């Protein structure tokens, strides 16, 4: 008896169904590094238009977390897709190396008692160790870049160019020195940038305090009264009693209506909208009378006594006064609040600051001298009670600024700092705020809501405090006059001389510099060397100048900055401000892309204490980096990205669908040589031409739309759908019969293989930016071998087809697919009751509208192959309907169709006439399916 299994074209796939990624990926990485893939790619891409994604530098401290992984994976997908789109897209990874967290770690490891030069040396060594650890993990994720030559903000050249950027801003006229209230961390002992502040709930005392009016006659006149008997008080409400020793004024709203109210305490001035609630707080229900009303502008320049100090307190009109809460009168301490500072500055009131850098009151402050501010609250409340000026006291929970490092409450404290002014006219007469808002208009945002967010932040932000009182940072390399505080008149030239020294020796060149090396003897007498360092956000915010503008392979401005949504306050903004404040005069990027934060499967923030942290190292060691990459790509990053073991298992199913499809495709291409065996499109079987159209349209959507607009979750969805629906459930299902049963070298089979070849090359190129390991594994088979890379090639070129022909083809096969789905549905009940097993055991009678019936009848004898049944007939009717039944034919041992001609050919007793022809004759021909 003949064994017909040897006559079918069942070939082994060179692409295994099991990826075994976690085990195999490291070996691929080693091979790519040895082949110098990144360097070869730079040579191949030379001369193409550039696409520059500038890397926002992660901080060089600790292991990478899942947020880092998402960020680097998204960047890598873009770099790879742009490369395959025909761009030269170099990627230079970077690290942020200066700043307090590294200082804290070095102090923990080595203590504080050492020369500052040695301390900075240890900081540099620590940062280098952290970078080496992080780099290893980033490479393991498959991120392609110039890892041998990353940029570090502690590189001597980068430090020097950061100093040059400071010089740019100085020359532009935006830099100034001032004593202004800034967010100050008592644990850091330093001012904080906006991006270093986070808000958490805090319980604070909420108190109502009476300020006695000095001149009740003037108060009466303001309310239109002839006179006032007894004492009168302005009542303020505050949640920061510790700021009262610095109180220098009381602010009222010019348009706010105020009432003069007679109470058991005396005459009180309160905002009309808040008076009722305030009086309840004071326990006043009887003996109350409203004497008069007036507006805040009439109260301007009245004077009061401080509630417990001997100090004159003027009443000012302030735009910041509201009637949302409190009393409508605001105690004003310019040393401890930006709005307070602004209103006092307008009235020419000189700032008084009783709190030092340790958060302690200076010696001249009665009762609280030497105390830390938080310790002073109960003392001040007691003091107010003694003077009779505490009307009410309670506790309130409210959102309050905290240090992002120490998680401790911040204070506003006036310090001598260096600022980049937002509303100061620069050398060109324009303010930095106006320039930055225009730059926002000129930037493209992904997602689009990022524009309004960044614009609102720039509109509302204070001047940028760029100085820090730390040791490990890029120095502010200025010489300051000892008496006037003015910068040296030759500061621009001196900055460049210092920058040249820093290029050679790093920042230590400044800290060890003797003034006499650069200044005359007279200047040495009159000028001090500034000891401040720069805000680390100035370091990273200047990398568009120190890196993008300096490195030969890059181009300024960058095409894209891509970071987490917190960077609207951080790197996006600091980069925008340095770009606009320098001679470049614009944003250093054309596009901004923002991704959300990673949360657990239930949408909760990840926390070590909760135990819901998913580490990227665990994921790639268990599942492989390609699964992590597919998860990142398949999640809509514009919101929060949820991850858990269950979610990763679902992602693995999608990966398996793609991989199994490729395994099938490669198996059926293993005896196909595209040069010798390919069939011209005009000679191809019709369904093969239709499949090519589907594949080309998929590529057009991904390469022409989803990849360019960074919509990777749509790209993944379409690829998985294409593999499962267009290929798995339709085309490949139909194709199996032709691939397996027709003659190996027949036009029918070679036509199918030609289509599969184009589909496979295109699909591998499309998955490669996301599944970089799997893409390269597949390209080793269909591309140019081990030394070749999918990245060395651009998107696949499909055979061209006439538009009209394509439209007709798609219309026809869309109708045929609809009929096929109806046939499948009609067979399901027969499968369920076990009347049939395979659909090939069934026959189908299809009733279809005239046009569809015409398409189906055009397939002739090949209709059964398209419908995946052993027999199919068509008749015209008003709507689509299918009657299915079990076939009464006999099963062919070779093709498994049920026909009435099994054994019809002598010598082929167990196979159908078609199979006998395919085995012993010239073989069948196919035109449609």
From Swiss-Prot:
Residues that bind L-isoleucyl-5'-AMP: 563
Required co-factors: Zn(2+)
Cofactor, free-text remark: Binds 1 zinc ion per subunit.
Residue ranges annotated as motif 'HIGH' region: 58-68
Enzyme class: ligase
Note on domains (UniProt): IleRS has two distinct active sites: one for aminoacylation and one for editing. The misactivated valine is translocated from the active site to the editing site, which sterically excludes the correctly activated isoleucine. The single editing site contains two valyl binding pockets, one specific for each substrate (Val-AMP or Val-tRNA(Ile)).
Protein name: Isoleucine--tRNA ligase
Protein species of origin: Neisseria meningitidis serogroup C (strain 053442)
């Amino acid at each position: 008896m003949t064994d017909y299994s040897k006559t079918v074209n069942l070939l082994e796939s060179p692409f295994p169904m099991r990826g075994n990624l976690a085990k195999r990926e490291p070996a691929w990485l080693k091979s790519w590094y040895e082949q110098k893939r990144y360097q070869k790619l730079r040579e191949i891409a030379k001369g193409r238009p550039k696409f520059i994604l500038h890397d926002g530098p992660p901080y060089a401290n600790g292991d990478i977390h899942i947020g880092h992984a998402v960020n680097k994976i998204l960047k890598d997908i873009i770099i790879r897709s742009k490369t395959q789109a025909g761009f030269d897209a170099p990627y230079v990874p970077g690290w942020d190396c200066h700043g307090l967290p590294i200082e804290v770690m070095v102090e923990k490891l080595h203590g504080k008692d050492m020369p500052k030069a040695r301390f900075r040396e240890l900081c540099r060594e620590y940062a280098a160790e952290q970078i080496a650890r992080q780099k290893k993990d980033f490479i393991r994720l498959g991120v392609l870049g110039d890892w041998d030559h990353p940029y570090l903000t502690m590189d001597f050249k980068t430090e020097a160019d950061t100093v040059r950027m400071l010089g740019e801003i100085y020359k532009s006229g935006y830099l100034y020195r001032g004593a202004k209230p800034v967010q100050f961390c008592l644990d850091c002992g330093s001012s904080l940038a906006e991006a270093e502040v986070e808000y958490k709930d805090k319980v604070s005392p909420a108190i109502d305090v009476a300020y006695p009016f000095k001149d009740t006659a003037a108060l009466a006149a303001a309310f239109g009264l002839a006179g006032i008997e007894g004492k009168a008080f302005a009542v303020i409400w505050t949640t920061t009693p510790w700021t009262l020793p610095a109180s220098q004024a009381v602010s009222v709203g010019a348009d706010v209506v105020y009432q003069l109210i007679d109470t058991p305490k005396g005459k009180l001035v309160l905002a009309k909208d808040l008076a009722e609630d305030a009086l309840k707080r004071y326990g006043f229900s009887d003996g109350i009378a409203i004497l008069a009303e007036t507006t805040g502008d009439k109260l301007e320049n009245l004077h009061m006594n401080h509630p417990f100090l001997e100090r004159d307190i003027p009443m000012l009109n302030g735009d910041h006064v509201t009637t949302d809460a409190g009393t409508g009168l605001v105690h004003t301490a310019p040393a401890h609040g930006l709005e307070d500072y602004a209103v006092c500055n307008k009235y020419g009131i000189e700032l008084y600051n009783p709190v030092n850098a340790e958060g302690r009151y200076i010696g001249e402050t009665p009762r609280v001298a030497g105390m830390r501010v938080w310790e002073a609250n109960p003392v001040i409340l007691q003091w107010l009670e003694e003077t009779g000026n505490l009307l009410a006291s309670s506790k309130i929970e409210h959102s309050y600024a905290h240090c992002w490092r120490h998680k401790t409450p911040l204070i506003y404290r006036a310090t001598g700092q260096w600022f980049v002014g937002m509303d100061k006219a620069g050398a060109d007469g324009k303010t930095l705020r106006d320039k930055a808002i225009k730059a926002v208009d000129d930037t493209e945002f992904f997602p689009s809501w990022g524009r309004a967010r960044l614009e609102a932040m720039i509109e509302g932000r204070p001047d940028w405090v760029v100085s820090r009182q730390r040791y490990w940072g890029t120095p502010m390399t200025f010489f300051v006059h000892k008496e006037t505080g003015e910068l040296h008149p030759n500061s621009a030239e001196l900055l460049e001389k210092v920058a040249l020294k820093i290029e050679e020796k790093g920042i230590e060149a400044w800290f060890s510099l003797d003034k006499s090396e650069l200044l005359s003897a007279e200047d040495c007498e009159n000028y001090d060397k500034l000891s401040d360092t720069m805000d680390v956000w100035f370091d990273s915010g200047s990398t568009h100048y120190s890196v993008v503008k300096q490195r030969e392979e890059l181009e300024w401005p960058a095409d894209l900055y891509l970071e987490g949504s917190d960077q609207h306050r951080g790197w996006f903004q600091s980069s925008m401000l340095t770009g606009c404040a320098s001679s470049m005069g614009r944003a250093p990027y054309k596009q901004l892309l923002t991704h959300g934060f990673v949360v657990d499967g239930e949408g909760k923030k990840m926390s070590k204490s909760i135990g819901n942290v998913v580490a990227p190292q665990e994921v790639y060691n268990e599942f492989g980096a390609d699964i992590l990459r597919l998860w990142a790509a398949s999640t809509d990053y514009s919101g929060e990205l949820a991850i858990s073991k269950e979610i990763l298992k679902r992602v693995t199913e999608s990966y398996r669908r793609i991989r199994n499809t490729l395994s099938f495709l490669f198996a059926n291409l293993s005896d196909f040589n595209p040069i010798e065996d390919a069939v011209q499109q005009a000679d191809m079987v019709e369904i093969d031409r239709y499949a090519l159209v589907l594949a080309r349209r998929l590529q057009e959507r991904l390469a022409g739309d989803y990849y360019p607009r960074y919509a990777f979750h749509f790209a993944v969805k379409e690829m998985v759908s294409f593999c499962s629906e267009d290929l798995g459930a339709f085309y490949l299902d139909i194709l199996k019969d032709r691939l397996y049963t027709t003659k190996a070298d027949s036009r029918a089979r070679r036509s199918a293989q030609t289509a599969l070849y184009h589909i496979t090359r295109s699909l591998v190129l499309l998955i490669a930016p996301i599944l970089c390991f799997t893409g390269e594994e597949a390209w080793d088979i269909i591309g140019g071998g081990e030394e070749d890379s999918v990245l060395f090639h651009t998107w696949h070129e499909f055979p061209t087809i006439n538009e009209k022909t394509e439209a007709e083809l798609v219309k026809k096969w869309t109708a045929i697919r609809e009929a096929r789905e109806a046939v499948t549905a009609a067979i399901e009940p027969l499968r369920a009751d076990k009347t049939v097993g395979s659909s090939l055991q069934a026959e189908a009678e299809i009733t279809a509208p005239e046009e569809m019936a015409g398409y189906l009848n055009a397939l002739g004898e090949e209709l059964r192959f398209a419908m995946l049944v052993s027999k199919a007939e068509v008749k015209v009717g008003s709507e689509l309907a299918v009657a299915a039944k079990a076939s009464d034919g006999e099963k062919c041992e070779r093709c498994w169709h049920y026909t009435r001609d099994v054994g019809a050919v002598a010598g082929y007793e167990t196979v159908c006439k078609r199979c006998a022809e395919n085995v012993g004759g010239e073989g069948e021909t196919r035109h449609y399916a």
